[in-house]
Structures are given as structure tokens and as C-alpha cells.
Amino acid sequence: MICAFLRVVRHAEKLHGSLGRQLLLPHFVLTKACLKTQPLRWGLREQKKTVQPRTVLGFTQKTFWTQGPDPRKAKEDSSKQVSINRNQREETGVSTSQKVKEAGRDVTYLIVVLFGVSITGSLLYTIFKELFSSSSPNIIYGKALGKCRTHPEVISVFGEPVKGYGEMSRRGRRQHVSFTEYANNGLKRIRVKFYIEGSEPGKQGTVHAEVEENPRSGQFDFRYIFVDVAPKRSIVVEDNRFQQS
């Protein structure tokens, strides 16, 4: 009987414990849920507090956020500006050096052109003097040879046609006529020497001719033309020495 009573008491305790757990479990769950949701409510309240503008003396205070300059962008802009300035300075230096080179090149070309023009002018003057001037040794030679070809005594001694040539070189080539220039009483004189021969075999003559500048006309007139023939014979083609003196 005592054992039955003890069993009843244990059963009653088990029932009481299970009922207590069933009653405490909803309360614990609700309490835990409240604890979990309470920070969210607090956060919402704080957010509402920060969002709501405050009123000071009837004016609504608003918060404005201004975004400052980005240091990276400022650094990039400064580097770009530095590179642009550097490029401009390099371009300026290159353009200056290029201008100096071009100026030096132009001066060099100008010097070369002037030198070429001076040489060309001197050559043209020499050619004109040799071909057309009355003081040219070649002109004097041509005129003297022409007078010898028409002179009767020269034709009879040498025969026709009479040919003229200059000094003989070592290689047997006939070079230009030899001439000498000198002045007498302020007047220029030119003396030439050349050789003639004709159809007569073994006949050769040496021609001596001299011209003097005419102060009135500026031309050169013959003073004399002599032809030396061996042995010790001279043919006077023209002699104006006494007339000019």
C-alpha cells in the first residue's frame, strides 16, 4: 500500500512538471522573441530620430553633405597638367632647335649659291674676254694670222693655204699661243708669238705681233706684225710704230 502511494505521488509530480514546462515554454519563447525584436525597434526609433529634422527657433535644420575633392583625381589631374607642360616645353625646345638648324642650313645654301654665282661669273667673263675682247690673245692671234694669209710675200714663200698654230708641247701637241702683257706710258701692250706653214715643204715661219691700247677708242691696234723665215729673213706684214709714236 505504501508502494502504491509512492507511485501516485511520483505520477503527480510528473504531471505537475510537464504542466509547468508547458506553461513556461510559451513565456520563454515570447520573452526571447521580445529580446530579439527589441533592438530592431530601438534601431528604427534611432533611425527615425536621425531622419527627422530638428526645429530650432521655428526654422527647420537640415543637414547637407558636400563631397570633397577626390585625392586620386586631383593627383591624376596634376600629373596630366605636368605632362602637358612638359610636352609643351619639349615641343618649344624642338621647334627652336629645328628653326636654328633650318637657319644654318639656309645660310649654308646661300653661301654655296653665292660662291657658285661668283665662279660662274668669273668663267663667263674669262670666256667673253677670250672670245670677244680685242685684248684677248686668241683674238690677236686670229687677226694677225688673217693678215699673214692675205699678204703676197708670205703666200709666195710658204704657199697656200697658210696655217697657224701655237707652241709645241713635249707630246707634240699644239697648245695656245704664247703672249706677254706689259704697259708703256700708261698704255697696255700685248705681244704674241705663233708659227705658220704652207704648202711648201720644209718652210716654217715664226710670227711676232704686238698690239697697243688706243686711249680714244679703248680698242687694241697693231703696232707691228713680223714673220721670221730662215735663214735670217724677216717679212714685214705691218708696221705702225712710227705712226703711233
Curated annotation (Swiss-Prot):
The chain crosses the membrane at residues 108-128. The keyword Magnesium does not apply. Residues 64-97 are annotated as: Disordered. PANTHER family: MITOCHONDRIAL IMPORT INNER MEMBRANE TRANSLOCASE SUBUNIT TIM21. Residues 70-79 have a biased composition (Basic and acidic residues). It is a single-pass membrane protein. Belongs to the TIM21 family. One of its GO terms (cellular component) is TIM23 mitochondrial import inner membrane translocase complex. This is Mitochondrial import inner membrane translocase subunit Tim21. It comes from the Eukaryota. One of its GO terms (biological process) is mitochondrial cytochrome c oxidase assembly. It is found in: Mitochondrion membrane. Participates in the translocation of transit peptide-containing proteins across the mitochondrial inner membrane. Also required for assembly of mitochondrial respiratory chain complex I and complex IV as component of the MITRAC (mitochondrial translation regulation assembly intermediate of cytochrome c oxidase complex) complex. Probably shuttles between the presequence translocase and respiratory-chain assembly intermediates in a process that promotes incorporation of early nuclear-encoded subunits into these complexes. Component of the TIM23 complex. Component of the MITRAC (mitochondrial translation regulation assembly intermediate of cytochrome c oxidase complex) complex, the core components of this complex being COA3/MITRAC12 and COX14. Interacts with COA3 and MT-CO1/COX1. Its main location: mitochondrion. Residues 1-18 form a transit peptide. Keywords: Membrane, Mitochondrion, Protein transport, Transit peptide, Translocation, Transmembrane, Transmembrane helix, Transport. It comes from Rattus norvegicus.
